[in-house]
């Protein structure tokens, strides 16, 4: 797993628009965070406030992104106005997105955090899981209380994630992942069976899984501010089952607030039913992780960065544009191991 990335999630029994509007108001951080207290408003989307992980104040800034399937925001933090070095994308997936046709009333809140390895402190990395997980619990309690609940609602699904650093340009990664003709190379549990159709935002096609069961795959890419969310739907028509696993790819220059940081973070978001094990599709988070490793290896080879793969799954300070291979010709992707 990528060392500079942390994600936490929670099911909240409220509607998507209510959750979105609440999160867009930075002043509401006063109510549910450990110690982010807004002191002075700078502009409609920016405040100066205290911080849970530092002994000094920070600027807090919010951006919004909209989609017809889900909603989301980004929180940005930094010590100077409009100079932000921490970014926190937040996604709100309605229950009907996780399970099409579901009668569950609620939203799955997914909070993604990046900490620049140049600026992070030991306390930030040692405390981020504890603090963000507890803050999610606080947010859930407030929003469900406002919705009339007197105890914590239990969602039908839980979210699990897998993140990895890819030493290749973001646009190459987005094109490669959305092109279903590449799926045979990196998705080892699927085999193409039939025609593929592609357009500029994705494609669809027919595949067989490891049990020779039919799988209709649909991929759709969405540009969200400075990163992409790539929807991946795997429909099993003979079993009336669909597995959704959105993929977020965000450039390291944005994730870490460093213009010289090269490559991108690949973050897989997966949904797992709480009441029964899956019988079709990917059955464990390691299946998604293995695919991510394949994508990393193949894309880094295409970008000419053949030394990065052996150094592990995480972004390191040495991975800057100053240390990139200048003038190197992209290598063709090799499909052999």
Predicted regions located by residue number:
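Structured core of small recognition/catalytic domains
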Residues: 188-195, 206-220, 224-226, 231-241, ...
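Central antiparallel beta-sheet cores of small beta-barrel/beta-sandwich binding domains
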Residues: 55-63, 215-220
